[in-house]
Amino acid sequence: KTQGNAGYIDVKEANIYEEKKIETLFKDADFCINLIGILYEKKRGNTFKNIHTVFPTILAKLCKKYNLKHFIHVSALGINEATDSKYAISKLEGENNILNNFPKSTILRPSIVFSNSDNFSTQFMTLLNRLPIFPLYYSGKTKFMPIHCTDLTEIIYHILTNKVETQVI
């Protein structure tokens, strides 16, 4: 479901592995917002490297080629500390590639993004209610602050409308 008046949001379907089709989406764009990420790898194609490193790098290069005003990339909280994680390493590599290829970028590092209708929040809250204890990873130093998708959307809107300078948030 999209939010916005007719003409302000133009939804297009594309496969992230079809670089030429992705490029056609940039020709009339002002901004690029990348929300794509995975929490676990599948055997075919959808690896951390492809999704978190290669694809964002392609987007950053296209932002530069078509002189977009801004690129917002949603990454992940706590990736600096998780140096032994393939997930975190791929996220950091993607961030570095973005900033090197298109400096007019903002990297957002939220924790888990949830909505009222997703399985994550329901399953997680059920676990918290049923378990007598809850395991804390990395000696309890894991940063875990779920954010509702509406709040994340408001942050992105604020960045775009207030011309927030490049930074990692």
What function would you assign to each model-found segment?
Residues N50-N101, S105-S111:
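Conserved Rossmann-fold NAD(P)-dependent oxidoreductase catalytic core, especially the SDR/UDP-sugar
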Residues N119-F120, S139-T161, Q167:
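Substrate-positioning beta->alpha
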Residues S85, T106-M125, K141-K143:
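Flexible, glycine-rich beta-alpha linker
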Residues Y17, I79, V113-S115, L152:
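Conserved sequence/active-site signature of Rossmann-fold short-chain dehydrogenase/reductase
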Residues K1:
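N-terminal Rossmann NAD(P)H-binding glycine-rich loop of SDR-like oxidoreductase domains
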Residues N5-K65, L77-E81:
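NAD(P)H-binding glycine-rich loop region in Rossmannoid oxidoreductase-like domains
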Residues D10, K104-T106, Q167:
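Conserved beta-strand segments of alpha/beta enzyme cores
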Residues M125-Y138:
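A short C-terminal helix-loop "cap" of Rossmann-like NAD(P)-dependent dehydrogenase/epimerase domains
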